[in-house]
From Swiss-Prot:
Species assigned in the record: Vanilla planifolia
Residues glycosylated per entry: N122, N251
Cysteines engaged in disulfide bonds, as pairs: C159-C202, C193-C235, C293-C343
Its job: Involved in the biosynthesis of vanillin (4-hydroxy-3-methoxy-benzaldehyde) and derivative natural products, key components of vanilla pods flavor. Catalyzes the double carbon bond cleavage of ferulic acid to vanillin and of their respective glucosides via a coupled non-oxidative hydratase/lyase reaction. Inactive toward p-coumaric acid, caffeic acid and their glucosides derivatives.
Pfam families: Inhibitor_I29, Peptidase_C1
Record protein name field: Vanillin synthase, chloroplastic
Cellular-component GO terms for this entry: chloroplast; phenyloplast
């Protein structure tokens, strides 16, 4: 029996080596892992030893996937193969960005949209913004991470709470810029407590409305005292745990990228929202653009934080912090084409003025 088991393990290692030998340098799977001991025997026992099965087993190991049945393994494998084909076909188009395998590669677009994106929000309240141009020379490029005021990338999990992470990201940056100290603020408080300001917890909301909530609430608690759970809950705000207060919130005029660039360039990071469409969930690097996403106030379905801008290969871009963890995109960040209000990135932009 032991001899048969040893033979089987040697066969798996040999087969994996053959599969790896055929990889192209730009294969989207290469970034997962190439160690033979990363193979999940349960997955290979169901799927066999074909090349895609090895790819899928390594993917599952890399991202800590757990499937409850053979049927689930087969289902997720089928989706994974479809996404892999989509990635390869997209990357062959020689676009300004590339896609790659990440933690969402075993989800259909519908599953991803349901679990990670909030409902579309109406941003028409920003039709006339209150951002004021201040004196100063606009930098050619900007990356607020270099100033040390951008907090670490977080992960919203399977909750459409992106708006809370965009909100706390802007507040954390403003706090650090003001005090020179870092902090982490409570997304869960916003999920649980901000519904009176037209926000809907895991079903979506807007940073501009969250800033107003924090202003009238008298502050937002720290992450340590009100930790993130990723589900709708009962409000448990405590005034003694407040980390930051909001004096006012500033809205960028709807669609005005010149205003947005001025704010990001000379003020600080700005909360923005845009429409995520199929393919963006598998973004890896480069300057993202799309001819299928919308730009209208009712199109936006995901809130993020613009932390800078620049030019890559002749294409101007926004540098944006996401809330899908550091395994996604470029260590949790992405670049979005600048100058076309791409996917509505300047449709729903705002930033807070804070106090301690």
């Amino acid at each position: 029996m032991a001899a048969k088991l040893l033979f089987f393990l040697l066969f798996l290692v040999s087969a994996l080596s053959v599969a790896l030998a055929g990889f192209e340098e730009d294969n989207p799977i290469r970034s997962v892992t190439q160690r033979p001991d990363s193979i999940e025997p349960a997955i290979l026992g169901v799927l066999g030893s074909c090349r895609h099965a090895f790819h899928f087993a390594r993917f599952a190991r890399r991202y800590g996937k757990s499937y409850g049945s053979e049927e689930e393994i087969k289902k997720r494998f089928g989706i994974f193969v479809e996404n892999l084909a989509f990635i390869r076909s997209t990357n062959r188009k020689d676009l300004s960005y590339t896609l790659g395998i990440n933690q969402f590669a075993d989800l259909t677009w519908e599953e991803f949209r349901t679990n990670r994106l909030g409902a579309a929000q109406n941003c028409s309240a920003t039709a006339h913004g209150n951002h004021r141009f201040v004196d100063g020379v606009l930098p050619v490029t900007r990356d607020w991470r270099e100033q040390g005021i951008v907090s670490p990338v977080k992960d919203q999990g399977s909750c459409g709470s992106c708006w809370t992470f965009s909100t706390t990201g802007a507040l954390e940056a403003a706090y650090t810029q003001l005090t020179g100290k870092s902090t982490s603020l409570s997304e869960q408080q916003l999920v649980d407590c901000a519904s009176a300001f037209n926000n809907f917890g895991c079903n979506g909301g807007l940073p501009s409305q969250a800033f107003e909530y924090v202003k009238y609430n008298g502050g937002i608690d720290t992450e340590q005292t009100y930790p993130y759970l990723g589900v709708n809950g009962i409000c448990n705000f405590k005034q003694e745990n407040v980390g930051v207060k909001v004096i006012d919130s500033i809205n960028i005029t709807l669609g005005a990228e010149d205003e947005l660039k001025h704010a990001v360039g000379l003020v600080r990071p700005v909360s923005v929202a845009f429409e995520v469409v199929k393919g963006f969930n598998l973004y890896k690097k480069g300057v993202y653009s799309s001819d299928t996403c919308g730009r209208d106030p009712m199109d936006v379905n995901h809130a993020v934080l613009a932390v800078g801008y620049g030019v890559e290969d002749g294409i101007p871009y926004w540098l944006i912090k996401n809330s899908w963890g550091t395994n996604w995109g470029d260590n949790g960040y992405f670049k979005m084409e600048l100058g076309k209000n791409m996917c509505g990135v300047a449709t729903c932009a705002s930033y807070p003025i804070v106090a301690v």
